[in-house]
């Protein structure tokens, strides 16, 4: 069995990578990918704790989080598609300048 500290370290590293993707990139698609990485890192922490405690609650929470993440992805990708059709770019700075 993997030690708890190693598993949490992996989850924290994934969360930080997602956060860096959100902060550094200015493209909406990459920001959404970073958000999904962060959500999956948090969901994996539920599984890690549930596995450590010997309960299935962590796995149930993971299924719930993944379901919510899938619906969030569907809505955000639909909005992303509409933004691209209207402004022909996914760059955040260009879209915020076109406010009117």
UniProtKB/Swiss-Prot annotation:
Pfam families: Oxidored_q2 (PF00420). Keywords: Cell inner membrane, Cell membrane, Membrane, NAD, Quinone, Translocase, Transmembrane, Transmembrane helix, Transport, Ubiquinone. GO terms for cellular component: NADH dehydrogenase complex; plasma membrane. GO terms for biological process: ATP synthesis coupled electron transport. One of its GO terms (molecular function) is NADH:ubiquinone reductase (non-electrogenic) activity. The keyword DNA repair does not apply. It is a multi-pass membrane protein. HAMAP family: NDH1_NuoK (MF_01456). This is NADH-quinone oxidoreductase subunit K. It comes from Blochmanniella pennsylvanica (strain BPEN).
């Amino acid at each position: 069995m993997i030690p708890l500290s190693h598993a949490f370290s992996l989850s924290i590293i994934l969360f930080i990578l997602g956060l860096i993707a959100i902060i550094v990139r200015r493209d909406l698609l990459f920001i959404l990918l970073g958000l999904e990485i962060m959500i999956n890192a948090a969901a994996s922490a539920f599984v890690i704790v549930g596995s450590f405690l010997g309960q299935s609650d962590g796995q149930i929470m993971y299924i719930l989080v993944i379901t919510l993440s899938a619906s969030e992805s569907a809505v955000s990708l639909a909005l992303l598609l509409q933004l691209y059709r209207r402004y022909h770019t996914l760059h955040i700075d260009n879209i915020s300048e076109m406010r009117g």
